[in-house]
Amino acid sequence: MMRRRVDLPPAEPQPWAALIPPESFYARLAVYREVLVTDEDYVPLYKDSGRGRPSIPPSLVVLAMLLQYHDDCSDVEAEQRLRFDLRWKHALGLGLEDVGFDATVLCHFRRKLLDRGLERVLFERLVNAAREAGLIARTAAQVVDSSHVLGAAGVRDTYALLRGGIRKLLRVLGYTGDRQGALPERLAWYLDPTQPEKPDLDWTDPAARAQHLREIVADARAVLALVPTEDPASLSPVVAEAAGLLAKIVADDVEEGPPPAPKRRGRPRQHPVGTLPPDEPPPAADLGPRLRQGVAPDRLLSVVDPELRWGHKSSHYRWPGYKVHIAEELTSELLTTVATRPANEHDAVPAVELVCEHQAHVGLRPAELLSDGAYGTADVRAALGERGIEVVARLRPLTDPKHFSKEEFTIDLAAQDGRGSVSCPAGITTNDYRMARDTQNRPVRLYRFPRQVCAACALRQRCLGGPCGRVAHPVRQPPGRQVQLHFHEAVLQQARAAQRTPEQKRALRERLRPRAKVERKLAELMRRHGLRQGRYLGRLKTDLQAVLTGTLVNAKRLLALAARDAYTARAVRQALASG
């Protein structure tokens, strides 16, 4: 068991306490600090030994971390505020002579929280206390949303990524110090601290850039050849990670062989049926290596933070970093879930995990989940519907003003004894389908209209030639219209039927009106308490920052609710003390 420090002064009222506004977070934290955080919750962080110096109480460190995120300050500034800020001393119960603790204590404590998986202890404790105090109902409606977090690492171009990956792999292989002389002069250059980070060449010259790329790609492959391959299982995790990182950079950002044909903009060229497109001269021979045209899926952006990704809010705005998802209970305005995910991951992917798995620890199961269209996909509706949770969200419309979309076809799943049928806007009905695979490799039905009927249809120009490649093929006969159903087509049809008429759309807007509360909560997290900018490298540490910031926001809200009346204050204190 940890040994508590005995040199800390007793928590007695200080003469400057009257100067602090009673409605401030500092004053409220001073009232509830003894029941808000307990040392017993963090016993697994310490060894059961009498050796070593007496430990700083973990409750004191956690409360200091809450104040740190409240004031959005660094570890060094938090150390200074522990010494000089009377508001912090009053909130933590420290005397004027107490100098607090060193900034490194905060760093070591965060690392131990992640190692033992205790970063959510206080967050779940506050949510459980709010539920036991009657501030949150188990089945209360909740609203979910997400926002972006800028990564702490810088984004690097391909040249810098390759140089950084080579340097990292050489270091983990042990080619430093005395062993650096065993490397060829070309590879030893990457470890020479006297050499510039960026080579001195004319970056405006395409030939010079191409030559430099060929050199560093050859160096990268030479360094990868230094990794033992006889027994891959015997490689240390650090070496395997660095080698995989460098190999991925080469695969994602560099291509070789004949260059691909240039992409045409707009619709493909139309050629008469039975003819071939005219021959085009082949591009000039350039076998590379050269920079890849386009962006590889899940491309790396940084060597120091390999999990950093580009996220897209729209077609015009993107950011390098991560995405934070939150869930908020509408009545109490308390957060029930905080989670950090990759920036390039769709919002619907973690929706079921956020609502079901995370909230199982706090005993909540909302009857309704309000969200925007990103969370309202058919897959999410089906998965949460099986758990008795209704998703209230708009379905994103299929916009194609020049052609008929899938919404304008009448789909009857129960027709023909379950075989189903699809009717087009011209009144033609088909039940002919074949089985296909969707993007998740699930079996779906693909209904096909007869080629001859579509060729003679008056609406052919509005039906064929749309964005899905329904164009005349230069050799094959022009196909008829095809309509692919969703894997959860019944759920999708039910959701669209509930928001079709103006009255239904108006009713849906009224149900979604409380969703604006989560925007204020996101603004509080991101702008007031600094979550917009990531402090640490990696998704796990960024998630730690998000969870601690969410814990602070919940503590502020819970103590504000407790200050409303004596009954709520007593219920909150009893719930915290019993938890």
Protein language model features and the residues they cover:
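Short, positively charged loop/turn segments that connect secondary-structure elements
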Residues: 87-105
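A ubiquitous short alpha-helical element
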Residues: 47-51, 506-509
